[in-house]
Regions:
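Feature marks hydrolase-like catalytic cores characterized by long aromatic- and Gly/Pro-rich stretches
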Residues: 45, 157-159, 184
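Structural recognition of alpha->loop->beta junctions
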Residues: 21, 29, 33-43, 113-122, ...
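Substrate-binding cleft and catalytic face of glycoside hydrolase catalytic domains
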Residues: 1-93, 98
């Protein structure tokens, strides 16, 4: 599986020199290039990653977030999925997010109403703030099965060290004082 074709956190800095129309054009051309180049080898793609947070992401300025603010979440997803589907009509296309709140459900519903060709719902089950357990796992599956699409757990983290405290909202902001991974 290819992961991801579009993501605000790994966006090339040099894109910032362009206007939003040019940025989108370059993103879509890259999707077309990569999906075509790997057809037959990679036929399953996380098309766009973590869109729930994308237009409000303010940790740093980046081109993908800027375009998403312009197009809106569903508009951005529709553009990227259309490019991926045109490049390989037989590919399995996933929408992927770590956010399992009602916001993701609303986003998926909006995409399906806009005829975005989502084949699979991707759910990240990072457990940085605690073990999910069967109860939460079943709860998440129950909520997202209502869309009638297969569900893939696309990313999963089991923490072997300190859990991230509950008050930390942006998980990448948490730093442990030391890494107890070596005996010395």
């Amino acid at each position: 599986k290819g992961h991801p074709l579009c993501w605000h956190t790994v966006c090339a800095d040099w894109l910032m020199q362009y206007d939003n129309k040019t940025i989108l054009d370059k993103i879509l051309k890259r999707i077309d290039r990569d999906v075509k180049a790997f057809t037959g080898t990679i036929d399953m793609w996380d098309v766009i990653n973590e869109v729930v947070i994308m237009p409000i992401f303010d940790k740093y300025d980046n081109a993908v977030t800027r375009v998403c603010k312009d197009l809106g979440r569903v508009g951005m997803i529709k553009e990227t999925f259309a490019a991926a589907k045109a490049a390989n009509p037989d590919a399995t296309l996933l929408l992927n997010d770590f956010n399992t709140s009602i916001s993701y459900e609303i986003l998926i519903d909006g995409c399906l109403q806009a005829d975005v060709p989502i084949d699979v719902i991707g759910i990240q089950s990072h457990q940085h703030q605690g073990y999910w357990g069967a109860e939460k796992l079943y709860q998440v599956l129950e909520r997202f099965e209502s869309f009638g699409k297969p569900i893939h757990f696309t990313e999963n983290t089991f923490v072997s060290g300190d859990l991230i405290p509950a008050h930390i909202v942006v998980l990448n902001d948490f730093l442990v004082p030391e890494w107890p991974s070596t005996p010395e």
